[in-house]
A protein has these predicted regions:
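N-terminal FAD cofactor-binding segment of flavoenzymes
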Residues: 20-82, 394-402
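A glycine-rich dinucleotide-binding beta-alpha-beta segment and adjacent secondary-structure elements
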Residues: 297-363, 370-372, 390-407, 412-418, ...
Length: 458
């Protein structure tokens, strides 16, 4: 047992993973959880690490992004992966769990740990006098959200997540897609997907009639500055909100055949090199990372079901065989403007004793949140020991996620594990087969991650 003491706010995936790791190092952890005194609109049980959406923790294969992330987590000593084994249910090549069993096992592990003291109460003030980890999740609200806003600047804390889909660069059809800026001004920073009239009309019809995902109650409530959607496909207009600054592309399509052509799909200032003429409409793709291995579909914030996104957005010229690494979502989501306020050590740049972990940082997904908890815990422990922990190498999944989180990005949005954020292999070492290529990338990542662990073993 050490004399170190750390406060952790939130007993979700990130908070529990961090608390268990720190406790294993002999740190006295004060873990605060607001349930059962206060429940968010999404949470129903009193247990820790409650899974509120899917019960899948995604693929286990090493040559998949989620499988690679799990391998890195195992090497860091993940306790939640042990709990997942206890709660495992059959799911083919994926790791899926009985959510009640999983939560019960994590709760048992936390409550059985002598170095963790659980406080079932809501915290509204952040005490910076000692290291504190905020892992309160994407539904953080009330006085604590105000406190975070005070520390980060209110404009650096987002309360609504409107995300466009992201595709891999290597899956695009460059016979159709071309690089250009409007009127050839400046660098050709965007890729362009030009429509002719027939292609656009077919795309518009498919988009306007596509099936939308149901909104959770906590996503659908009216927010300041929101307007009711008058065409909500059967949903009550007073329960569905449309944000003019991030309007779903399908609602724009429903407003008229030409609405998109005078909005995000406007073709002005562009020439299709195949025809020598201005396209009827044009979709732009913007690089999501410096390596330009990922592109987001500009202006395509959406609430379509994921299968519908794949079907409809694959009608965009050049995206017929696109690999989607993230589908668009629109939901209530409290997260930091991480590139501006968060260091690579997952603490605030201006308040270094205040650490963050989980989805509130911009790590998107169950296992990503847990991995973020492990990384934050290691950084906190290094700080207690008077050391600074370097971020994992960028050719590892954890390192690539940290780099994404902390690299300047005017359009920052949460990101989950995907192979597209990892640096590509050198051309002479790149297998043509995608499965073999991903395996080679994963093996490189594991070796690099293991070396990082050995060099920073404290």
């Amino acid at each position: 047992m050490s004399n170190y003491k750390v406060t952790v706010l939130g007993a979700g995936l990130a908070g529990c993973e961090a608390a268990l790791w720190l406790a294993g190092k002999g740190v006295q952890v004060e873990l605060y959880e607001q349930k059962p005194a206060h429940f968010s609109p999404a949470h129903k049980s009193e247990g820790f690490a409650e899974l509120i959406c899917s019960n899948s923790l995604k693929a286990e294969r090493l040559d998949s992004a989620s499988g690679l992330l799990k391998e890195e987590m195992r090497r860091m000593g993940s306790q939640l992966l042990n709990a997942a084994e206890v709660a495992r249910v059959a799911a083919g090549g994926a790791l899926a769990v009985d959510r009640d069993t999983f939560s019960a096992e994590v709760t048992r592990m936390v409550e059985a740990e002598p170095n963790i003291t659980v406080h079932r109460e809501r915290v509204e003030h952040i005490d910076e006098s000692a290291p504190i980890l905020v892992a309160t999740g994407p539904l953080t609200d009330g006085a604590l959200a105000d406190e975070i806003g005070r520390l980060t600047g209110d404009e650096r804390l987002h309360f609504y997540d409107a995300v466009a889909p992201i595709v891999t660069a290597e899956s695009l059809d460059y016979e159709k897609v071309f690089a250009a800026s409007r009127y050839d001004r400046g660098e050709a920073d965007y890729l362009n997907c030009p429509f002719n009239k027939a292609e656009y009309e077919a795309f518009h019809a498919a988009l306007a009639s596509a099936e939308r995902a149901p909104l959770h109650e906590f996503d659908a409530g009216a927010e300041q500055g929101a307007q009711p959607d008058p065409d909500a496909h059967g949903k009550k207009a007073d329960t569905v909100t449309v944000y003019e600054g991030c309007m779903p592309i399908e609602i724009m399509a429903a407003r008229g055949a030409d609405t998109m052509r005078f909005g995000p799909l406007r073709p002005v200032g562009l020439i299709d090199p195949r025809t020598g003429h201005r396209p009827w409409a044009n979709v732009q793709l913007r690089a999501e990372n410096k390596e330009r291995t990922l592109y987001n579909i500009v202006g395509f914030q959406t609430n379509l079901k994921w299968g519908e996104q794949k079907r409809v957005f694959s009608m965009i010229p050049g995206l017929e065989n696109a690999e989607f690494v993230r589908y668009g979502v629109m939901h209530r989501n409290t997260f930091l403007d991480a590139p501006r306020v968060l260091s690579a050590g997952l603490c605030l740049k201006e308040h270094p004793n205040v650490f963050f972990a989980g989805q509130i940082t911009g790590f998107e997904g169950y296992m990503e949140s847990a991995a973020c908890g492990l990384l934050a815990a290691r950084n906190i422990y290094a700080r207690l020991e008077g050391k600074e922990l370097p971020a994992p190498p960028i050719d590892t999944m954890c390192g690539a996620l940290i780099q994404y989180l902390t690299t300047e990005n005017r359009h920052f949005q949460p990101m989950g594990a995907n192979m597209g954020i990892l640096p590509p292999l050198p051309e002479d070492q790149r297998p043509r087969d995608k499965r073999l290529r991903y395996m080679a990338v994963a093996e490189r990542a594991v070796a690099s991650f293991q070396q990082w662990l050995e060099e920073n073993n404290f």
